[in-house]
């Protein structure tokens, strides 16, 4: 069941990588990376690997488009959400959902011992729940049809 799934379980399925961009990069450069990799957010990482924030499509829409700024001259550091809302590897899927909901974010960097080990997105959460529900449905179908039990031979 998805209530026992941890952030680390999601990363073990999807991988521990993440896409990062320096704070001095332009919003336009960030959008190109996001489009090339079909992602909705990038981690903003300072020289030395320190996580500075998260830059998302939402940040772009609210802080560039609505304010009439230029994506070619505005830096990611000016637009990123900071400090970043982060998860730990031991955090349950339910806790990740609550963190996302309460903070109105769709991407959680997962931190272990001060280092980013991956990102859990709202899409990852939804996919995990769907997988869990499919497994439950299969178990129930097998139980109902008897497919998970050996055939019984009547002896009289």
Predicted regions and their residues:
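Tandem CBS (Cystathionine beta-synthase) repeat/Bateman regulatory domains
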Residues: 1-156
């Amino acid at each position: 069941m998805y209530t026992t799934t941890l952030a680390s379980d999601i990363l073990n399925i999807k991988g521990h990588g993440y896409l990062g961009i320096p704070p001095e990069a332009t919003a336009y450069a960030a959008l190109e990376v996001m489009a090339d990799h079909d992602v909705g957010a990038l981690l903003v990482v300072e020289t030395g690997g320190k996580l500075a924030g998260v830059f998302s499509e939402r940040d772009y829409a609210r802080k560039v488009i609505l304010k009439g700024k230029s994506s070619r001259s505005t830096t990611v550091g000016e637009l990123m959400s900071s400090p970043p809302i982060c998860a730990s590897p031991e955090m349950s899927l339910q806790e990740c959902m609550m963190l996302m909901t309460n903070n109105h974010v769709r991407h959680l960097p997962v931190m272990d011992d001060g280092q980013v080990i991956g990102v859990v997105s709202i899409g990852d959460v939804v996919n995990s729940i769907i997988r869990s529900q499919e497994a439950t449905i299969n178990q129930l179908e097998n139980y109902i049809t008897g497919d998970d039990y050996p055939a019984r031979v009547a002896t009289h």
